[in-house]
From Swiss-Prot:
Taxonomic placement: Eukaryota, Viridiplantae, Streptophyta, Embryophyta, Tracheophyta
Effect of S26A: Abolishes ABA-dependent phosphorylation
Organs and tissues of expression: Expressed in roots, leaves, flowers and siliques but not in seeds.
The encoding gene: ABF2
Self-association and partners: DNA-binding heterodimer. Interacts with ARIA.
Record key words, sorted: Abscisic acid signaling pathway, Activator, DNA-binding, Nucleus, Phosphoprotein, Transcription, Transcription regulation
Name the UniProt record assigns to this protein: ABSCISIC ACID-INSENSITIVE 5-like protein 5
An example Gene Ontology molecular-function term: DNA-binding transcription factor activity
Post-translational modification: The activation by phosphorylation is induced by abscisic acid (ABA). Phosphorylated by SRK2C, SRK2D, SRK2E, SRK2F and SRK2I in vitro.
Length: 416
């Protein structure tokens, strides 16, 4: 395999026999009737959130039953994975039922005018099928999800293909002619780690076209048929680069940097720092991307639009319901804990008040008993004093009288 590979300038290919969402042995090639009969559920009344969860469960069951393990060094044979890429559901569709979404798609197909939630590719498909109106049971899961605007992350599949093709002397091999000249705008810790781990040579410098990890690619690196049928204005214009010939592996590959969250690429690779082999620190500078082709975003609700609006790329609410519930439960726990502490404080305060009241009552009772005893003692003393005073008065009267007085007698009445 030639070391110089430009993922964006390769001739269009069939992608190993499968463009779009499906591959051989995929669940997405089943129709709704087949999927409902195999699962045993009615998906018409389910919302899109529950439909995706059922599809993921069926994927996991199929992967466990098949027992296929991805092999990095096995070429295209290692790509026969039963587990598909993750799906990104727009916020406007997460709570709609499957019947409602299908009615909207049917209306768009009959009128020929696309709504805000449908891409131009879905409009073209609906117009081509306007001659014969399909039912929901005849539509495959792939067609339904594409027309509804659900986005697939197939960049990781392309990354595995590149790893399988370059395993002989690529990212972690010992060949020295497999480096690529990567020129991007800001460093990422994953890029630094990959640059340290890789055995980078210094013989040749090859250009690597940087593409978003959310753009679906075929096995040979070409764009899918959906992207070939529609070209839009690029979100990021081409910028001049300085061409540092750094012998590095495909550090921008989604297999190395792991892709982003829910269809988003690693945005840290679009910053303003470049790396040079053998340098002990990063060299800041406005480094561009060599041979950058215009990025063609997939026209859907889940990925960027023509005006660069990426508000719909935010993750769906159902993916973070656990975090919201955790915050709510934490708040409730705090309120309950605060209430319990307040109740404990009130109980302790009431107990202290009762103890003070009881102690005060006991003290008052003791004081009353003491006062009663003192009163009785004083009354006894007063009685004794009164008796003594009475006796003294009687004795004083007797002493003052001194005995019986003599009576005056007339002994002689006269001289005669």
């Amino acid at each position: 395999m030639d070391g110089s590979m430009n993922l964006g300038n390769e001739p269009p290919g069939d992608g190993g026999g499968g463009g779009g969402l499906t591959r051989q042995g995929s669940i997405y090639s089943l129709t709704f009737d087949e999927f409902q009969s195999s699962v045993g559920k009615d998906f018409g009344s389910m919302n899109m959130d529950e439909l995706l969860k059922n599809i993921w469960s069926a994927e996991e069951t199929q992967a466990m039953a098949s027992g296929v393990v991805p092999v990095l060094g096995g070429g295209q044979e290692g790509l026969q994975l039963q587990r598909q890429g993750s799906l990104t559901l727009p916020r406007t569709l997460s709570q709609k039922t499957v019947d409602q979404v299908w009615k909207d798609l049917s209306k768009v197909g009959s009128s020929g005018v696309g709504g805000s939630n449908l891409s131009q590719v879905a409009q073209a498909q609906s117009q081509s099928q306007s001659q014969r109106q399909q039912t929901l049971g005849e539509v495959t899961l792939e067609e339904f999800l594409v027309r509804a605007g659900v986005v697939r992350e197939e960049a990781q599949v392309a990354a595995r293909a590149q790893i399988a093709e370059n395993n002989k002397g690529g990212y972690f091999g010992n060949d020295a002619n497999t480096g690529f000249s990567v020129e991007f705008q800001q460093p990422s810790p994953r890029v630094v780690a990959a640059g340290v781990m890789g055995n980078l040579g210094a013989e040749t410098a090859n250009s690597l076209q940087v593409q978003g990890s959310s753009l679906p690619l075929n096995v040979n690196g070409a764009r899918t048929t959906y992207q070939q049928s529609q070209q839009q204005q690029p979100i990021m214009p081409k910028q001049p680069g300085f061409g540092y010939g750094t012998q590095m592996g495909q550090l921008n590959s989604p297999g190395i940097r792991g892709g982003g969250l829910v269809g988003l690429g690693d945005q840290s690779l679009t910053n303003n720092v470049g790396f040079v082999q053998g340098a002990s620190a990063a060299i800041p500078g406005a480094l561009g991307v060599g041979a950058v082709s215009p990025v063609t975003p997939l026209s859907s609700e889940g990925i960027g639009k023509s005006n660069g609006d990426s508000s719909s790329l935010s993750p769906s609410p159902y993916m973070f319901n656990g975090g919201v519930r955790g915050r709510k439960s934490g708040t409730v726990e705090k309120v309950v804990e605060r209430r319990q502490r307040r109740m404990i404080k009130n109980r302790e305060s009431a107990a202290r008040s009762r103890a003070r009241k009881q102690a005060y009552t006991v003290e008052l009772e003791a004081e009353v008993a003491k006062l009663k005893e003192e009163n009785d003692e004083l009354q006894r003393k007063q009685a004794r004093i009164m008796e003594m005073q009475k006796n003294q008065e009687t004795e004083m009267r007797n002493l003052l009288q001194g005995g019986p007085k003599k009576k005056l007698r007339r002994t002689e009445s006269g001289p005669w």
